[in-house]
């Protein structure tokens, strides 16, 4: 049954809101249902006022808009002007849905890399500890193991509060949420109550949006200024994280995590061991320590596990419980997923690494465990930060023995132009293998690999599509790699 509420409870200072009862708050006219209030604010393409006719035809009982109206766009009689409407939406949605984030343990995770892995691993840890958990992020929104894709890392503000209300109503006790810099800059998480917030790292990404690293970092830092946050878990090995830690508000619990033995750390990993079967380390909290043996691959997954450990520590779990549950956590789809490696086949690893730092970390993690060659397949997304393309080329050339450059998601950009931007970063572009057909590139990379080699397929990870000219075609790196490996096995059997 749909909720209803007098609009005056959400806008008590607006006289026109009296005597109107609404059943929902909606910003997309195509999603309006009878009884909803349609919220018209400026978007990236057009102002919401351009879609009032559609909203009214679908049954909107109130039109809320943020003045001034764009030139040439008429405002219908009865539309309610609300100054500062966008900034009020979070509080309005939170109240309309009955403050859902206050009914659950809420953890927000921000940072350039590691958000998805940390969120998914935390939800998995809660599940293992008997807590009914849910996630919100790149993979979608839903209870643990029941995630539905949304298309956003962090949903838009009205949609987000609606999702949180649904999770609460479905019995979620704890929610792990990715919080992107775009979401923080655009107010998508306004009105959300967080118990714990997490910072993973800050490296180059999204400069097409933020302009420079200073503004990018400032957007991330907004999460730590949210009202009523009880604790902050921060990677103090990251220089920006250390600055963040020392700038936290008084009274907020500070949990520094470190692999490097930083003096500001409360939770540390020591005596690391890494191989293609997994990672091991001693988890240290204060004077106590416990052993962790995890099937996850890669040095950076130690950081992700430490972030999870930091959250559980902030929520008052004991060291023994934390170490035990970390050892049970399984790999996440599209994050350092390992295939092959048997019957003379090479090991194939699929990972979402799509930033210079992430690609460098994955290649570095794999290179120390490869007996033969490290072969890398990667591309760069279209209509995104062009500056990182040449940087990723430098990293691939420095860390891999063989490099295939291919298409990622060209989107509306010319694929040949993207490849040219990437090749400009190679010192020896003539030895780079260019194959824009991603399936063919994956097949070629696996085809030249021996049993001692490792093939990294980077950039798309969990994605099950490839976006070309505005159309998303079915595509899954993992499935393509599986088919290639299966075909190799079949050929060996015939021989």
UniProtKB/Swiss-Prot annotation:
<keyword id="KW-0573">Peptidoglycan synthesis</keyword>
<keyword id="KW-0132">Cell division</keyword>
<comment type="function">
    <text>Catalyzes the addition of meso-diaminopimelic acid to the nucleotide precursor UDP-N-acetylmuramoyl-L-alanyl-D-glutamate (UMAG) in the biosynthesis of bacterial cell-wall peptidoglycan.</text>
</comment>
<feature type="binding site">
    <location>
        <position position="384"/>
    </location>
    <ligand>
        <name>meso-2,6-diaminopimelate</name>
    </ligand>
</feature>
<dbReference type="InterPro" id="IPR036615">
    <property type="entry name" value="Mur_ligase_C_dom_sf"/>
</dbReference>
<feature type="binding site">
    <location>
        <begin position="408"/>
        <end position="411"/>
    </location>
    <ligand>
        <name>meso-2,6-diaminopimelate</name>
    </ligand>
</feature>
<keyword id="KW-0436">Ligase</keyword>
<dbReference type="GO" id="GO:0071555">
    <property type="term" value="P:cell wall organization"/>
</dbReference>
<feature type="binding site">
    <location>
        <position position="29"/>
    </location>
    <ligand>
        <name>UDP-N-acetyl-alpha-D-muramoyl-L-alanyl-D-glutamate</name>
    </ligand>
</feature>
<protein>
    <recommendedName>
        <fullName>UDP-N-acetylmuramoyl-L-alanyl-D-glutamate--2,6-diaminopimelate ligase</fullName>
        <ecNumber>6.3.2.13</ecNumber>
    </recommendedName>
</protein>
<dbReference type="InterPro" id="IPR000713">
    <property type="entry name" value="Mur_ligase_N"/>
</dbReference>
<dbReference type="InterPro" id="IPR013221">
    <property type="entry name" value="Mur_ligase_cen"/>
</dbReference>
<dbReference type="GO" id="GO:0051301">
    <property type="term" value="P:cell division"/>
</dbReference>
<dbReference type="InterPro" id="IPR005761">
    <property type="entry name" value="UDP-N-AcMur-Glu-dNH2Pim_ligase"/>
</dbReference>
<keyword id="KW-0547">Nucleotide-binding</keyword>
<feature type="binding site">
    <location>
        <position position="463"/>
    </location>
    <ligand>
        <name>meso-2,6-diaminopimelate</name>
    </ligand>
</feature>
<keyword id="KW-0131">Cell cycle</keyword>
<dbReference type="GO" id="GO:0005524">
    <property type="term" value="F:ATP binding"/>
</dbReference>
<dbReference type="GO" id="GO:0005737">
    <property type="term" value="C:cytoplasm"/>
</dbReference>
<feature type="modified residue" description="N6-carboxylysine">
    <location>
        <position position="220"/>
    </location>
</feature>
<feature type="binding site">
    <location>
        <position position="186"/>
    </location>
    <ligand>
        <name>UDP-N-acetyl-alpha-D-muramoyl-L-alanyl-D-glutamate</name>
    </ligand>
</feature>
<keyword id="KW-0067">ATP-binding</keyword>
<dbReference type="Pfam" id="PF01225">
    <property type="entry name" value="Mur_ligase"/>
</dbReference>
<feature type="binding site">
    <location>
        <position position="188"/>
    </location>
    <ligand>
        <name>UDP-N-acetyl-alpha-D-muramoyl-L-alanyl-D-glutamate</name>
    </ligand>
</feature>
<dbReference type="Pfam" id="PF08245">
    <property type="entry name" value="Mur_ligase_M"/>
</dbReference>
<dbReference type="Pfam" id="PF02875">
    <property type="entry name" value="Mur_ligase_C"/>
</dbReference>
<dbReference type="InterPro" id="IPR035911">
    <property type="entry name" value="MurE/MurF_N"/>
</dbReference>
<comment type="pathway">
    <text>Cell wall biogenesis; peptidoglycan biosynthesis.</text>
</comment>
<feature type="binding site">
    <location>
        <begin position="111"/>
        <end position="117"/>
    </location>
    <ligand>
        <name>ATP</name>
    </ligand>
</feature>
<comment type="similarity">
    <text>Belongs to the MurCDEF family. MurE subfamily.</text>
</comment>
<keyword id="KW-0133">Cell shape</keyword>
<dbReference type="GO" id="GO:0008765">
    <property type="term" value="F:UDP-N-acetylmuramoylalanyl-D-glutamate-2,6-diaminopimelate ligase activity"/>
</dbReference>
<keyword id="KW-0961">Cell wall biogenesis/degradation</keyword>
<feature type="binding site">
    <location>
        <begin position="153"/>
        <end position="154"/>
    </location>
    <ligand>
        <name>UDP-N-acetyl-alpha-D-muramoyl-L-alanyl-D-glutamate</name>
    </ligand>
</feature>
<dbReference type="GO" id="GO:0000287">
    <property type="term" value="F:magnesium ion binding"/>
</dbReference>
<feature type="binding site">
    <location>
        <position position="459"/>
    </location>
    <ligand>
        <name>meso-2,6-diaminopimelate</name>
    </ligand>
</feature>
<keyword id="KW-0460">Magnesium</keyword>
<feature type="binding site">
    <location>
        <position position="180"/>
    </location>
    <ligand>
        <name>UDP-N-acetyl-alpha-D-muramoyl-L-alanyl-D-glutamate</name>
    </ligand>
</feature>
<dbReference type="InterPro" id="IPR004101">
    <property type="entry name" value="Mur_ligase_C"/>
</dbReference>
<dbReference type="GO" id="GO:0008360">
    <property type="term" value="P:regulation of cell shape"/>
</dbReference>
<dbReference type="InterPro" id="IPR036565">
    <property type="entry name" value="Mur-like_cat_sf"/>
</dbReference>
<feature type="short sequence motif" description="Meso-diaminopimelate recognition motif">
    <location>
        <begin position="408"/>
        <end position="411"/>
    </location>
</feature>
């Amino acid at each position: 049954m749909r909720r209803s509420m007098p609009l005056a409870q959400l806008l008590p200072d607006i006289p026109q809101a009296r005597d109107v009862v609404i059943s929902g708050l909606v910003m997309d006219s195509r999603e309006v249902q009878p009884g909803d209030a349609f919220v018209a604010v400026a978007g990236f393409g057009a102002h919401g006022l351009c879609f009032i006719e559609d909203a009214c035809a679908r049954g909107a009982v109130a039109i809320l808009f943020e003045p001034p109206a764009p030139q040439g766009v008429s405002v219908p009689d009865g539309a309610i002007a609300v100054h500062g409407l966008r900034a009020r939406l979070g509080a309005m949605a939170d109240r309309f849905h009955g403050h859902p984030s206050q009914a659950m343990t809420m953890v927000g995770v921000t940072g350039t890399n590691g958000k998805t892995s940390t969120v998914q691993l935390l939800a998995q840890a809660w599940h293992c500890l008997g807590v009914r958990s849910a996630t919100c992020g790149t993979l979608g929104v839903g209870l643990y193991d029941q995630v539905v894709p949304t298309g956003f890392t962090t949903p838009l503000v009205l949609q987000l509060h609606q999702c949180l209300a649904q999770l609460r109503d479905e019995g979620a006790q704890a929610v792990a949420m990715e919080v992107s810099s775009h979401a923080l800059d655009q107010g998508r998480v306004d009105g959300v109550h967080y118990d714990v917030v997490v910072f993973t790292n800050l490296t180059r990404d999204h400069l097409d949006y933020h302009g420079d690293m200073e503004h990018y970092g400032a957007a991330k830092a907004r999460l730590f200024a949210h009202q009523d946050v009880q604790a902050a878990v921060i990677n103090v090995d990251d220089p920006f994280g250390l600055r963040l830690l020392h700038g936290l508000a008084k009274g907020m619990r500070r949990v520094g995590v470190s692999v490097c033995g930083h003096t500001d750390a409360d939770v540390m990993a020591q005596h690391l061991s890494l191989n293609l079967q997994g990672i091991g380390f001693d988890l240290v909290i204060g004077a106590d320590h416990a052993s962790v043996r995890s099937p996850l691959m890669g040095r950076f997954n130690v950081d992700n596990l430490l972030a999870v450990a930091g959250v559980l520590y902030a929520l008052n779990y004991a060291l023994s419980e934390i170490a035990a549950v970390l050892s049970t956590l399984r790999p996440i789809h599209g994050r350092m997923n390992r295939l092959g490696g048997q019957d003379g086949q090479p090991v194939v690893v699929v990972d979402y690494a799509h930033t210079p730092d992430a690609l460098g970390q994955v290649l570095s993690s794999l290179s120390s465990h490869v007996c033969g060659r490290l072969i890398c397949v990667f591309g760069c997304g279209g209509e995104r930060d062009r500056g990182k393309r040449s940087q990723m080329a430098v990293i691939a050339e420095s860390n891999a023995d063989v490099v295939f450059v291919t298409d990622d998601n060209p989107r509306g950009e010319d694929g040949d132009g993207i490849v040219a931007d990437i090749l400009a970063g190679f010192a020896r572009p003539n030895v780079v293998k260019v194959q824009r057909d991603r399936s063919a590139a994956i097949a070629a990379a696996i085809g030249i690999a021996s049993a001692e080699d490792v093939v990294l397929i980077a950039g798309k990870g969990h994605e099950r599509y490839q976006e070309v000219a505005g159309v998303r075609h079915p595509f899954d790196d993992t499935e393509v790699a599986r088919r290639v490996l299966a075909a190799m096995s079949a050929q060996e059997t015939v021989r």
